[in-house]
Amino acid sequence: MPRGLELLIAQTILQGFDAQYGRFLEVTSGAQQRFEQADWHAVQQAMKNRIHLYDHHVGLVVEQLRCITNGQSTDAAFLLRVKEHYTRLLPDYPRFEIAESFFNSVYCRLFDHRSLTPERLFIFSSQPERRFRTIPRPLAKDFHPDHGWESLLMRVISDLPLRLRWQNKSRDIHYIIRHLTETLGTDNLAESHLQVANELFYRNKAAWLVGKLITPSGTLPFLLPIHQTDDGELFIDTCLTTTAEASIVFGFARSYFMVYAPLPAALVEWLREILPGKTTAELYMAIGCQKHAKTESYREYLVYLQGCNEQFIEAPGIRGMVMLVFTLPGFDRVFKVIKDKFAPQKEMSAAHVRACYQLVKEHDRVGRMADTQEFENFVLEKRHISPALMELLLQEAAEKITDLGEQIVIRHLYIERRMVPLNIWLEQVEGQQLRDAIEEYGNAIRQLAAANIFPGDMLFKNFGVTRHGRVVFYDYDEICYMTEVNFRDIPPPRYPEDELASEPWYSVSPGDVFPEEFRHWLCADPRIGPLFEEMHADLFRADYWRALQNRIREGHVEDVYAYRRRQRFSVRYGEMLF
């Protein structure tokens, strides 16, 4: 290879990242127009397009590099010099942290995810002293109640870039003040002020104002979801001011926000104060930088692994028919490997399973489907693996494992947020907690269905409970679009003997689903059955599901709220908005 080629390659990779992030910002900047035009299908398409941008631009750079090197192989020393040149380009680069992840992605694509060592990749950042440093560019604006909170909030709302008419701005302001007074008290509120992010956060059918409520006793989140009426007028649906509420809004089971962030590290650092329970990876994920979030997630895993004496074990819960799931006992993630062979009743391929996981990545997760990070050639030290798990891995996934002596390499796996399996949770709770869990489960099914997702396998074991008590779906191998399912009523038996027969007396075609059958496995527990019948009996009716299908086919996009219905101003304060 000619000398000087290393610098050209480094510059080409960085220019490729510039192009990718420029397109990322371009798609993001269209969020306001899509919101104002109530073009909800364009919102969904833009979300998918933005996710695809990263891999598309990695592919473009890889093709450029193959042309530059004329397809010649490169030795280890050459690659190290490329990384050295790339590192020298980063000290004055504003998005250096994501540029490092882009370099990693290009390397992995070029070398088929092999030889992934700290010398060749940015396993940890090359600029640790710059990470999360305060950046001078102001991200937010302060508002003080010099003339009272009504005047303050009028200024905040008037500062918004939205061009639509407000349904009743004065009413919304009084609702917010009423909520803040109930939360803080009159005296504390008088001594508090707001800091509001310059950019709105767009997701689904809402534009979120995100701010900080700075009080004498500390800083609280200040979140206002802005929606539209059917007539295209704006209204504020609620005001959220607790870290738990904010954590759910920015949760791992929700779609990524569209927020214009030329300096994502600065925004992540600004958000950290109101989302103290979120990791760096989760914050990058929330603002749509999912590939860099994967880098940060892997770093968090390495840091945890270095500081613990634990071994990987099989994850608690009923063993899956398709996925082998393991975890570290104290770590908040699980690792999922597709088995070599599935249970006989699972008539599908590994490629189908991967396609299902990709569908979830790109689809609106409505707060009910866990996000995942996908890894190839994942290295584990054998000393970190319990003997029982090692035996299970070799028994169930041997084709995906390469033995390197003191290490194994797993060819492909997913990492996902760890939750308590719902079936285990239901065994452990009673009273109101049991009722809440069943209500949450039914709501999860409804919200998934309204978003055109049918879970397929609705058993409790395929759902998890988050630390906030939300029920989230996490087993995707049978997932499909609602519009692909044929929901049928079970025909009446022809003869009394039909109901005793081992085979159904009616024909069943691929894609047929009989909601009446859900009762058999969802209501078998006498503690659960009556609750389910009380709250979710309509889920057992085929006409309920067909009505949802009709709404989807007519192009209707349902509202998705990241908070309880009872928190809506229209419910709390009695005035209906429509």
From Swiss-Prot:
ATP binds at residues 315-321, 336. HAMAP family: AceK. Its main location: cytoplasm. It is found in: Cytoplasm. The active site is at residue 371. This is Isocitrate dehydrogenase kinase/phosphatase. Bifunctional enzyme which can phosphorylate or dephosphorylate isocitrate dehydrogenase (IDH) on a specific serine residue. This is a regulatory mechanism which enables bacteria to bypass the Krebs cycle via the glyoxylate shunt in response to the source of carbon. When bacteria are grown on glucose, IDH is fully active and unphosphorylated, but when grown on acetate or ethanol, the activity of IDH declines drastically concomitant with its phosphorylation. Coiled coil: none annotated. Its EC number is 2.7.11.5, 3.1.3.-. It holds the Pfam family AceK_kinase. NCBIfam families: PRK02946.1. GO terms for cellular component: cytoplasm. GO terms for molecular function: [isocitrate dehydrogenase (NADP+)] kinase activity; AMP binding; ATP binding; phosphoprotein phosphatase activity; protein serine/threonine kinase activity. Keywords: ATP-binding, Cytoplasm, Glyoxylate bypass, Hydrolase, Kinase, Nucleotide-binding, Protein phosphatase, Serine/threonine-protein kinase, Transferase, Tricarboxylic acid cycle. One of its GO terms (biological process) is glyoxylate cycle. The gene is aceK. Belongs to the AceK family.
